[in-house]
């Protein structure tokens, strides 16, 4: 079945919000062996909505539309649909009853006048129940194309999609094939290098597709396998995933939706290790990432933001003479910070970062973007210099991710011994 999606709203085409609905729909369909072939986004304009429906209708068996079903003057979807399909707009009693019932649930007192725009539905349509919001959706058939219309509110749309739209399509798309997919999350390699390493995995007619998506500072590698049976798709995916993991090695830090902090945390918990942090240029970003993971209290002891030189000395025991002699941004100071936080916290691992995030403060010897990362463990202390050159925010993000990756890689190597 050829399925297209249409997102409606001025807020989308003006960049005020990101269209998450389209991604939600596409992912949900993939999970059921169906795919989106085209996607359009238009503003709150009746002519544009009508043109988009006509355009997609010529090449689609089904169109899933979100947005424009609200009560305000710029919600124009139902009017556009009525005009585009030659239907009349009428008060749908079922939609009206639902509207009043939901308004009462939301605390609107009896007797308060409620605009009934959301109960105006084109004739010859079937309602799509909305268990969590005021606006019912609806679907219809026009020129051989199923058309589904749902609110743009993501929480409402998602429920309606899974409870009504996908079951309807799945029942009618009898020719759909089994699709299985897997995301491999990669850090520490550029997109061209990842592409080079994965060359040859996808062969003509093998039933596999590969996609790379840069989501700074990581790269998501998506493997999608398609076959006549679930078992066939899973076998194709398994072989491809094994090959990709072997080629990318430890640069694959997780699969699916696990982030780098979660990957490091999983290893810390599994190995019974504890962690303490001393941060300068990142200002607590590493600790924020660590503590965003549920259960981090099982391994994270403390984090200290020692931004100034005095704080480095008082809190971490870094000698003032060392700072004066080598500079706050130096391998020697980074190592002293890592050892200091490990000793004061009594942790298994002590990680420290110090650097120049800019835009000022750089020198010829130590330009903006110079960062030192140090990891103190029972095995000793490892310190390295990095030069990240993408601006203040990106320097801090890259430092944070590199530090987390250091923790992850150390624990991987430790478990392999």
From Swiss-Prot:
The family assignment reads:
Belongs to the CinA family.
State the organism named in the record. Pelobacter propionicus (strain DSM 2379 / NBRC 103807 / OttBd1)
Which positions make up the signal peptide?
none
Pfam families cross-referenced by the UniProt entry: CinA, CinA_KH, MoCF_biosynth
Q: Which domain of life is it from?
A: Bacteria
Record CDD domains: cinA (cd00885)
What Gene3D superfamilies does the record point to? 3.30.70.2860, CinA-like (3.90.950.20), MoaB/Mog-like domain (3.40.980.10)
Q: Which SUPFAM superfamilies match?
A: CinA-like (SSF142433), Molybdenum cofactor biosynthesis proteins (SSF53218)
Protein name according to UniProt: CinA-like protein
């Amino acid at each position: 079945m050829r399925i297209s999606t249409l997102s409606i709203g001025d807020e989308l085409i003006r960049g005020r919000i990101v269209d998450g609905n389209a991604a939600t729909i596409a992912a949900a369909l993939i999970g059921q062996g169906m795919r989106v072939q085209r996607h359009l986004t238009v503003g709150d304009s009746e002519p544009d909505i009508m043109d988009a429906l006509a355009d997609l209708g010529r090449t689609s068996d089904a169109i899933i539309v979100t947005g424009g079903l609200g009560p305000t003057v710029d919600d124009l979807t139902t009017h556009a649909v009525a005009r585009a399909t030659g239907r009349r707009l009428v008060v749908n009693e079922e939609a009206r009853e639902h509207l009043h019932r939901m308004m009462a649930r939301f605390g609107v007192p009896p007797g308060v006048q409620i605009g009934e725009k959301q109960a105006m539905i084109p004739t010859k349509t079937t309602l799509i129940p909305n268990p969590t919001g005021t606006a019912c959706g609806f679907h219809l058939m026009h020129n051989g194309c199923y058309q589904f219309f749902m609110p743009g509110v993501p929480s409402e749309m998602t429920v309606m999609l899974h409870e009504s739209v996908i079951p309807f399509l799945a029942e009618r798309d009898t020719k759909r094939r089994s699709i299985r997919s897997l995301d491999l999350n990669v850090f520490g390699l550029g997109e061209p290098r990842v592409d080079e390493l994965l060359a040859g995995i996808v062969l003509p007619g093998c039933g596999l597709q590969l996609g790379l998506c840069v989501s700074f500072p990581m790269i998501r590698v998506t493997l999608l396998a398609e076959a006549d049976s679930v078992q066939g798709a899973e076998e194709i995916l398994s072989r491809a995933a094994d090959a990709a993991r072997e080629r990318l090695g430890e640069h694959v830090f997780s699969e699916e939706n696990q982030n780098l902090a979660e990957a490091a945390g999983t290893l810390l918990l599994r190995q019974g290790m504890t962690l303490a942090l001393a941060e300068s240029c990142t200002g607590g970003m590493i600790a924020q990432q660590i503590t965003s993971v549920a259960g981090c209290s099982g391994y994270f002891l403390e984090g200290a933001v020692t931004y100034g030189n005095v704080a480095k000395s008082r809190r971490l025991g870094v000698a003032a003479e060392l700072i004066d002699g080598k500079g706050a941004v130096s391998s020697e100071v980074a190592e002293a910070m890592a050892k200091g936080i490990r000793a004061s916290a009594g942790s298994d691992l002590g990680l420290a970062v110090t650097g120049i995030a800019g835009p000022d403060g750089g020198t010829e010897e130590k330009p903006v973007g110079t960062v030192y990362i140090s990891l103190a463990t029972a095995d000793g202390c490892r310190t390295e210099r990095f030069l990240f050159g993408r601006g203040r925010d990106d320097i801090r993000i890259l430092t944070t991710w590199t530090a987390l990756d250091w923790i992850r890689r150390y624990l991987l190597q430790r478990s392999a011994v």
